[in-house]
Amino acid sequence: MKENQKLLLLCGDSYQNISLLAAVKEAQKLNVKDGNVLVLYLGEENTITQEAGEQVVVSKLKLDALRTTLLSYTGSRLLLAFADKQILNLLFRLEETGFFKDASIRIIGPSLQRYRTFYQQADQRRLFQELGYQVPASALVGSVREAIEFSEGIQFPIMIWPVASKQGQGRKIAHNLDDLCEAVETGLSVSPSQQCLLEFSTYGFKELDFVVMRDREDNHYLAASIESIDPVGIHSSDSYQFMPAVTLTDREFQNLREAAIHISRYLKLTGAISIKFALDPTSYAFYILEVNPFASDSISLASMGLGYSLFEQGVQLQLGRSLEHLPHPLLKDLKAVYEPSLDYIFFKIPIFSDAAKNARLNTQIHSYGAVYGFGKRIDEAYQQALETIKDKNLLTILPEEMSDDELIQKIARHMPHRLFYILEALKRGFEFEELLDLSKLAPVYLQVLANLVEMEKVAEAENKPAFLPVEPSAGLYEVKVGAAYYLTQNGTNESLGLDAACVLVDDLEICDEYFYQKVRKQVKELKEKGQQVILLTNRPFTESLADKVYYLPINETSLHLIQTIDQVKDIIKLSDRQ
């Protein structure tokens, strides 16, 4: 391959830099075998691009800038797994001029023509209808007047989607005509095509994400089902979420699974694909909200919950590898096509800054990160994530100091930390039915919180702490070396002790963008000295870094539990607070 002929991972701006961080990590791995992989980031220079050095090429998100940059890499290949709709818009325009043919640049994975079929939400809706799926009534508008005309034939609330806006900027739910006019005016200003998709809102429906992995030969599996506790109308990044989805009936689950696979197959998408659904809680009816074949927070969450990177596997599939030939990342003697069957719950709690604590949650992102927990049950996984919040002093509110009236207002208004307010109300003896009416939570979710209150009353002497591996076969297959373990309060321990091991404590900040590089560097240095390394961390990694990993809150209790299993000769704390 000539010097200027590269594999370019096109990457756009994203929430918490998920796309950029994942692209840089995959480029580093691919370059171990082939030094001709670069990340082409369309956005502004930032600390991540600077830290990555020559690994990342930065270009403005402009047509001329992208054309000029690509001309430096004639004969190269483009991979779009980390791109977004704004990048697609530029690529479509370049394709129309014959640029890619003239520059001998080839797009690998799904073709641009394939992406065109669902580039706009309106196109997606038509496609879903052709496939026999329900879609909300909708219209593509280019002016406020057109929006008003559409609203006259439909009931509020109405969802406004600016077409191809950056990170979903401008999305809003309008509850009346004034809301609609304001939202459409804003949406038109942030849409590259000056268009907005208006649709009947599924506000209040149950929101779910299904992640499908598929290769060119149509081998596929359902990697994850993610359930949001907050309903449609609150951005999934701000919602409490868990996987796998366990409150669905078998019929509901199978309907959504079949739809996710059917759509991925029909569109001939490869790699990791996230499909977002709205499920009517009063019937089996569901709506398809979005199909996303790019890096997303859903795929990131699924990767952390499974213990291996779906980004990495997705890149391999887009490069032409087969699920039947790729080895499974975690399980011995298995191929990657294996469909996960989890016997644990992985839970996400969003975290908010002090400035956002009084915001009213909606379709815009207000959180700046998240903490996670594992457990045998939803309440146990939630409790573990909650301990991390307490240990890190991330909670910017004090529900116990609020009056009953204040709690009621916070619960009813869909504000950040809402579950903390509900927990406090349960402790004060609020009636279950009263909280159902206030919060509009599904009864099953409120029962989880009620269980938590009861858990706090159980004497510690009744608990039998045990470590179980994070793996996708529910204990059916043996895990590879370097497995990660989570803690459950009742079970049989499966973590075999290590002798004379060093415990590396990941006490870095929750939103430290370089945590992966820092931890990997420290583990490598310790291993080069011949040490066995145990990693204690409260953030799930998607690959094996140490000889063993424990996902636990960072505190003395966790260290004590590890020392009951492993012979620890040294403890090293990796922290930003030296």
What are these regions (language model features)?
Residues 465-482:
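Long, low-complexity segments enriched in small/aliphatic residues
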Residues 143-154, 195:
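Conserved phosphate-binding catalytic cores of ATP/NTP-utilizing and phosphoryl-transfer enzymes
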Residues 76-84, 429-433, 475-479:
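N-terminal-biased segments
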Residues 471, 489-492:
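Low-complexity, acidic/Ser/Thr- and charged residue-rich accessory regions of DNA metabolism proteins
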Residues 140-143, 271:
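Short, glycine-/polar-rich solvent-exposed loops and beta-turns at beta-strand/coil boundaries
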Residues 2-65, 69-74, 97, 131-132, ...:
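ATP-dependent carboxylate activation and anion-phosphoryl transfer catalytic cores
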Residues 61-135, 140, 566-578:
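Conserved N-proximal alpha/beta basic substrate-recognition cap immediately N-terminal to
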Residues 83, 143, 554:
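Flexible loop residues that form catalytic
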